[in-house]
Amino acid sequence: MRVTLLGPQRRPTLAEVARSTGLTGRVATITAGWQEREPDDSELSGLLGAQDVNLSLYWRWLDVQERDPEYAAAQRRLRDALGELQDVYLLRLDYALQAVYAVQRRAGSGSSVAEAIAAVRELDDAHLRRIGQERAEFYQAWAPHDRPVIAGHRAEVARLLSGAAALVVAGGHVGVLTETLHLFNVAA
């Protein structure tokens, strides 16, 4: 699948790009980043020639929270744990970067600066490993594919995507977008 990144659409270019690529057929859209405004996609639909189907990922996410409260509570606990990890990481990163700047001011360049930068990279790597570990533990304990509500939504999203000639992801809240894209297995 070809990817075309358009950026902000203050002056819409989507219709022009769709025409120039020869796009024909149904287009799946994701407006989950708009959150409660997800269904307000008439302008987007118009730009696509009304040949679109909104995957309604935000609505599906809300449905999972309502119909599978245990999963939703576990997901909130994960979000809180990841938030705490992020807060501690940012605190540590701030001091590590201050050390880099201090070494640069004192030593200019050379091995001391390289070592300070390496310490920042090690901190980044450790943070990514810890987040990966938290997520892996969550998905092992709460396997989304085994949750009936999620599995049903995943199947419907897969069906809609299988009939689509293209996928358009509108902007919005990046955290909500990544969460819903992952939960409903859009990349599969």
Where would I find each of the regions flagged by the language model?
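Short alpha-beta junction capping motif
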Residues: 186-188
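Extended, subdomain-level signal for the structured scaffold at the beginning of enzyme domains
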Residues: 1-168, 173-176
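Glycine/threonine-rich flexible loop motifs
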Residues: 174-184
